[in-house]
UniProtKB/Swiss-Prot annotation:
Gene Ontology MF term list: nuclease activity
Top EC category: hydrolase
Protein's UniProt name: Putative pre-16S rRNA nuclease
UniProt source species: Ruegeria sp. (strain TM1040) (Silicibacter sp.)
Cited function: Could be a nuclease involved in processing of the 5'-end of pre-16S rRNA.
């Protein structure tokens, strides 16, 4: 089930649970996973997009192998908060994904996540080639960590 409001997504999840975070792009899908208590996000891999069936099969393999209970997609809003074509593509991917899994699917505002990931990789003195290889799943971990922190705040209030 797709939850447009982040609070609804958080409420649909068990208290302590592992999530997968996705940075959905035109050519790749960055994948990050959280630990089982939903505290720390870790970059996992970048899927080179081919067809939805192949992409979703790889995601479902990751989910099955890690006891994941929710899917979080970064929503690439414009800087003014409006939604453009990339948001529409992300929402379409979420709709298609909801047809192959019963897990709750939520969205997190991903504005500037790739910029933050790029900056962190530069500070770590990562080579240009290596940055290109890991940027998407590092960005996915930034997206997922932001959502995990927000969930912790919601649940402590």
């Amino acid at each position: 089930m797709i939850h447009d409001a982040f609070e609804d997504f958080a409420a649909a999840l068990p208290q302590m649970t592992a999530l997968v975070g996705l940075d959905f792009g035109e050519k790749t899908i960055g994948v990050a996973v959280s630990d089982r208590i939903g505290a720390v996000a870790t970059p996992l891999e970048t899927i080179r997009r081919k067809k939805f069936t192949l992409d979703s099969n790889r995601l479902l393999e990751i989910i099955a192998g890690r006891d994941i209970n929710g899917i979080l997609l970064g929503l690439p809003r414009n800087m003014d908060g409006s939604e453009g074509p990339r948001c529409q593509s992300t929402r379409a991917f979420a709709r298609n994904l909801s047809r192959v899994t019963d897990l709750p699917i939520g969205f997190w505002d991903e504005r500037l996540s790739t910029v933050a990931a790029e900056r962190a990789l530069l500070e770590a003195d990562t080579s240009r080639k290596r940055r290109a290889e890991v940027i998407d799943h590092v960005a996915a971990s930034y997206i997922l960590q932001g959502a995990l922190d927000r969930m912790r705040h919601i649940r402590s209030s």
